[in-house]
Each structure stands twice: as structure tokens, then as C-alpha cells.
């Protein structure tokens, strides 16, 4: 990344490229972040992108957490997670094209439990005055989309035929819209 959400010092990223991108560090202790001081320049870049998408009529599914994190933002602890989510909601909820995605491939984020995801969801529900769309994206394990806070089923799958079958099944089961985010990674 060019910028980071917090003030502080990241681990050494000099050798980070397309080839090394998925070689994750188990020890993230070389990152030195102040989780109480946001890097506003980082968020200004997002401000601009979200506004540009809005002008184009494109929805922005804002992913709050992800498992591909060598910087330690996936393991900040409950207090810092909640503070981060409150900040992001205060900053972006007023954009009419924002959706909240608690995580990309939530089941690969080993630092969070289902209770953590439910707590984070409750922060979003409590803090978002505009009641933007909310969901959580899966890896191999679908989330329980029957939860009241979930507004739509955010799904990933690599089999387009199975996705078609599951769309009907999920619509009938959860009575919510079904969005397939990564069907065969088109594009």
C-alpha cells in the first residue's frame, strides 16, 4: 500500500510485489501503529475514490477487515476494532453509494471469532444513521445470513452452476437479496 490507516511505521515492504504478495508474515511485531491516531491522508484517498464511484453510479462495498494483512490490522483487539469501525462509519456513512462488508473471506481471518463479527456488526448497526446495506463475505464457509443485521447475502463461489442453485436456495431460506461477489473472478 501507498498509505496506511494509522499513524506509525509499517513492517518492511520493500520486497512486496506480485510474486511475494501472498507470503505472509506470522510475526507482525515489526509494525508499530498508534491505533488511536488515524492517518487522515490515507482516508482522503478513499474519500476521493468513493466520490468518483458515486458520480459514476457505482456502489462501493467497503471491506472493513481482510485476512491478507501483514500489517496487523486484523488483530488490533476489540476496543481498537470498534474504534476503527466507528471512525469509518462516521466518515463514510453519509455517502449514498456505500455498503458495509465486515470482511472479505471472514473465515480466513483467524484473529476473529463469530462473536467478534457479531460485535462488529452491532457497532455498525448502532452507529450508521443511514442504515446502509451490510453483509460479510465468505471463503469456504458461508456466514449465517439469517442474522438480523445482514441485509443481503454476500457470497463467493467459483462454480457458476452451483452459484445459480444456491441463489434460489439462499433467497428462499433467508428472504434477502443474494449478491455473488466473485463468480469465476470475471473482469
Regions found by a protein language model. Give the residues of each.
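Glycan-recognition surfaces
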Residues: 146-187
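Active-site mouth of glycoside hydrolases
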Residues: 1-163
